[in-house]
C-alpha cells in the first residue's frame, strides 16, 4: 500500500550523507529487487524529469533550496506512485524557484495522470496547480471547487 503513495516533505528530508543519486535511489533499493543498472536508469530518468540529471553526484549541502526540493520530488515519484502528497511545497522558496516548482507540479500532474494532494497555505499558488481545491477553516471544509469557482464565490 505504501508504495502507491509518494510524499514530498516540507523540508525535503534528504539524507545528508548520500548523494542526490543515492537519495533518489533509496526507495528503489529498499522496496524493490531491481538491478543496479535498472535503478540507475530509473533514477536518472526521474532526475531528468525535474531538470536535475546533471546533479546526480552532488550532495544535499551543494544544492540550493529549489534544487533540493526538486531532488525530493524526484525521490517522491521514483516508485511511480498513484497518489503524490505534497506538504507545503512552496514554503521558503525564492520567487524563481517557486515558479519552477509550481510549473513542475502542474506539468507532472498532467503528464503522469496521477492524483496529487497539495497541503499549502499559499492559496494563489494552489490555484495554478489544482483542478479542485478544498479550503479549510477551524478543521472543517469552508469551501471547495475549481480555482475559478472559488474566485467567483470569494468575489460575491
PLM regions with names:
Residues 37-54:
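Conserved ABC ATPase "signature" region
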Residues 84-87:
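Catalytic Walker B motif of ABC-type/P-loop ATPase nucleotide-binding domains
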Residues 80:
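Conserved catalytic motifs of ABC-family nucleotide-binding domains
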Residues 120-121:
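H-loop/switch region of ABC-family ATPase nucleotide-binding domains
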Residues 140-156:
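Conserved beta-strand-loop-alpha-helix hinge in the C-terminal portion
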Residues 126-128:
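A short, surface-exposed alpha-helical micro-motif characterized by mixed small hydrophobic
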Residues 59-63, 67:
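Conserved ABC ATPase signature
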